[in-house]
UniProtKB/Swiss-Prot annotation:
Keywords: Decarboxylase, Lyase, Pyrimidine biosynthesis. Its EC number is 4.1.1.23. It comes from Prochlorococcus marinus (strain AS9601). The lineage of its organism: Bacteria, Bacillati, Cyanobacteriota, Cyanophyceae, Synechococcales. This is Orotidine 5'-phosphate decarboxylase. Pathway: Pyrimidine metabolism; UMP biosynthesis via de novo pathway; UMP from orotate: step 2/2.
Length: 242
């Protein structure tokens, strides 16, 4: 019983690419989903009401808008979204130490202003869509993805953020540097490792958790499954297996 509860707390269902009615139908099919990720597309389409509806369904919400701007703009945005009562928000760690510190402070102030629990703030490191070749070519970087992830995770930690978002490939490396109270949230999770879609640095659920991930963001492996609830149950089983 406790084991299953722990598994439910580790899975964040990404409902990106779905409209609100499709998302609600998916959640009806998957009653054990505890966490939901709302991305940029859905939030822009539906606005803050999507948060109200999901909270009405007793879901915990990762609002993954990946803010990246000057410190004043980022912190102002974090102040506003924190008033919505979401549980986790994401910001780009590459915005710099001041932007991260100011955003964390603003998220606390925003939540406090309406008497809701402050959200965790996590720093985005290197997007899982990047391969090493694309990362070095597109961004004109000479160092490795791992080196950049380490640097951005440290920046997030030093700024007082609650964790970071990284690919499962970097989880083991980061977990050796940071204790379990520093959240490591990992997209790029696939049940079938051959199904990459637009992700490159991917891993199975069991491998990612075994390497030290706190939470897994999983979308298409569940939402595109013939039986989404069965796919979710299989993920729980894989996490629980030794």
């Amino acid at each position: 019983m406790n084991k299953r509860f722990n598994s439910e707390d580790k899975i964040i269902l990404a409902i990106d690419g779905l409209d609100l009615s499709q998302a609600k139908l998916l959640l009806e099919k998957c009653p054990h989903v505890k966490w939901v990720k709302v991305g940029l597309e859905l939030f822009v389409r539906e606005g803050p009401r999507v948060i109200e509806i999901l909270k009405g369904l007793n879901k915990k919400i990762f609002l993954d808008l990946k803010f990246h701007d000057i410190p004043n703009t980022m912190s102002a945005a974090c102040f506003q979204v924190s008033k919505l009562g979401v549980d986790i928000i994401s910001i780009h760690a590459s915005a710099g130490l001041k932007a991260l510190k100011d955003s964390k402070k603003a998220s606390l102030e925003g939540a406090t202003s309406v008497s809701v629990k402050p959200p965790f703030v996590v720093g985005i490191t290197v997007l899982t869509s990047f391969s090493l070749k694309d990362f070095q070519t597109d961004l004109d970087r000479n160092n490795s993805i791992e080196e950049n992830v380490l640097r951005l995770a440290k920046l997030s930690f030093d700024a007082g953020l609650d964790g970071c978002v990284c690919s499962p490939w970097e989880v083991k490396m980061l977990r050796s540097n940071y204790k379990n109270n520093f959240e490591l949230i990992t997209p790029g999770i696939r049940l079938n490792i051959d199904s990459k879609d637009d992700q490159n640095r991917i891993m199975t659920p069991h491998e990612a958790i075994d390497n030290g991930a706190s939470k897994l963001v999983i979308g298409r492996s569940i939402s595109k499954a013939i039986d989404p609830n069965m796919a979710l149950i299989e993920i729980f089983k894989s996490i629980d297996s030794d």
